[in-house]
């Protein structure tokens, strides 16, 4: 406790957070602007000493030139830049340093006390390092030559290497390292001889020891397969990898290393933000590649299967022009071209085939004399009902074109999706579809077939009116008997009965 020069009537207890050497309780006057000379002197000395942290380790005397020549710090002094700490008083006689973050502060671990410390263990002192044999970087087989005293690198006939302890016991707690190699800033492992580390920015780096001219002997230490054979623990300190002896290693024993608990926690402590950033970066890259493929093949409307389709649970094999959302302009352009080709082909072929169509089809609307109008309409009605009955009896009411078109109503969507197939509503449409010379080369839907047929009918009727000739009424019974759909005996009997009674010519059909 500090002794005040004058007695103070009113005192206030305040915790001093700036001084670590003095007592944690200080006496201040109520008036903050009037402090004694002893307090001012104490604060002045404290400000000069705050933040100075001395790390005591066992070192070897080595010049900076040798550090540069051999590519490793001979002193093995920990990097002070990694110790970004905030002093704070804790209970007990010894003041400990509490870190701001586990990743910003590196601790050493005492195997005897099973406790972490920053500079030295209160019971066993600073950490003990086992130095490598100095070998310049770039020397062939440098990694094997850097083996410390008391150990050796053994190579078998297959070319595999291993490390073994010889001559003397390696005490528990001794530290080997750091692991040397090429540092890569990429957040992935570079190979079998690489170790991952986490930097201050919470990003992964790797130390690759595959190059024997730059690595050291630690690359030959084999990973432990069983817990009982493990005698080394790998841990990270100041963006470097060290091996710590977790028990005494006796002569003739092979060195086996495994990951320490704090090292595994450090690897798993990568922030969720970094993970999301990596995932977002990969997804953007994938979408960019997909868009480039679509631009390279603009005619392919199917395109690649997008991630959004799979996330929504849609089947990639069902084609429902959901791709139209991705290619709206291409879809509209293709549909316009289809209808344009159909219309042009229909108009061009209408004049050439008008006369043939007027003579061959019985479904064209024609103006006939009044006395034949009723008979013609009634016979057409009877013929329609006969066709429906025959189709229901034999199940042949649907005319099909290419194979694979379903007749079930539930598959209507699939029929509309295939532009090369359609379902005709009449034998005339079926004949149009079956004749390859009658159809344009462009594939189209059933409505296009009906449109073409209608255009031909109207054109044929217009040509007949312009010529001033009235079309002769067709002789229905012979034509009906020649139709393939009336090959059924029941249909023949109906028309033969009508002919025998003479009701067709007398206009009494259906009456």
UniProtKB/Swiss-Prot annotation:
It comes from the Eukaryota. There is a cross-link at residues 88, 155, 172, 200, 214 (Glycyl lysine isopeptide (Lys-Gly) (interchain with G-Cter in SUMO2)). It is an enzyme of class 2 (transferase). Its EC number is 2.1.1.-. Belongs to the class V-like SAM-binding methyltransferase superfamily. Highly expressed in lung, including bronchial epithelial cells and airway smooth muscle cells, as well as in peripheral blood mononuclear cells. In tonsils, expressed in B-cell types, including naive B-cells, centroblasts, centrocytes and memory B-cells (at protein level). In benign hyperplastic lymph nodes, expressed in germinal center cells in both the dark and light zones, as well as in scattered cells in the mantle zone and the interfollicular area (at protein level). The gene is PRDM11. Keywords: Cytoplasm, Isopeptide bond, Methyltransferase, Nucleus, Phosphoprotein, S-adenosyl-L-methionine, Transcription, Transcription regulation, Transferase, Ubl conjugation. The modification Phosphoserine is found at residue 63. The lineage of its organism: Eukaryota, Metazoa, Chordata, Craniata, Vertebrata. This is PR domain-containing protein 11. Disulfide bonds: none annotated. Residues 149-260 form the SET domain. It is found in: Nucleus; Cytoplasm. It comes from Homo sapiens (Human). Residues 389-438 are annotated as: Disordered.
